Amino acid sequence: MGLSSLPGPSEGMLCVILVNTALSISIVKGIVRSFLGIVGISLSPSSSSPSSVTVSSENSSTSESFDFRVCQPESYLEEFRNRTPTLRFESLCRCKKQADNECSVCLSKFQGDSEINKLKCGHLFHKTCLEKWIDYWNITCPLCRTPLVVVPEDHQLSSNVW
């Protein structure tokens, strides 16, 4: 009857308690974030300025500090409309080979009289499809994830100066 190599009950309990505490905190954090997202408050990693609107991957800090950013989809949609003009498909693509072009959101082909938006990245989408995309709080291109509205460089620099 040798000595047992298994830990005693009191030794193993500390690890179990720590793991359960960490998991519980993570779950509560996820629930709070989901609730705030439903209410209309999005959490974004903050840069040094609380008034920053967007944070690029270069500027994001690794700390866990967050700022609350309330952004109405209507205001973002208006800004998108002001910066991205609506075009007719026939005026943009006068070539005969129009069968290749389709909207990646609704998967239907562009007609000659279709109102489309051409993004900075070069992708084409129906105006209504892209506006519906923005209504669902998506602020990037559906295909390549580049920002729909580009923040000017001088605005980004001024928002990162404390």
Curated annotation (Swiss-Prot):
Induction: Up-regulated by salt and osmotic stress. Not regulated by abscisic acid treatment. Up-regulated by the DELLA proteins RGL2, RGA and GAI. Pathway: Protein modification; protein ubiquitination. Keywords: Abscisic acid biosynthesis, Membrane, Metal-binding, Transferase, Transmembrane, Transmembrane helix, Ubl conjugation pathway, Zinc, Zinc-finger. Its EC number is 2.3.2.27. Disruption phenotype: Contains lower amounts of endogenous abscisic acid and is more resistant to abscisic acid treatment during seedling establishment. A zinc finger (RING-type) spans 103-145. InterPro entries: XERICO-like (IPR044249), Znf_RING (IPR001841), Znf_RING/FYVE/PHD (IPR013083). Function on abscisic acid homeostasis at post-translational level, probably through ubiquitin/proteasome-dependent substrate-specific degradation. The keyword Cell inner membrane does not apply. GO terms for molecular function: transferase activity; zinc ion binding. This is Probable E3 ubiquitin-protein ligase XERICO. Interacts with UBC8 and TULP9. Ubiquitous. Higher expression in actively growing tissues. It is an enzyme of class 2 (transferase). The chain crosses the membrane at residues 12-28. It is found in: Membrane. GO terms for cellular component: membrane. It catalyses: S-ubiquitinyl-[E2 ubiquitin-conjugating enzyme]-L-cysteine + [acceptor protein]-L-lysine = [E2 ubiquitin-conjugating enzyme]-L-cysteine + N(6)-ubiquitinyl-[acceptor protein]-L-lysine.
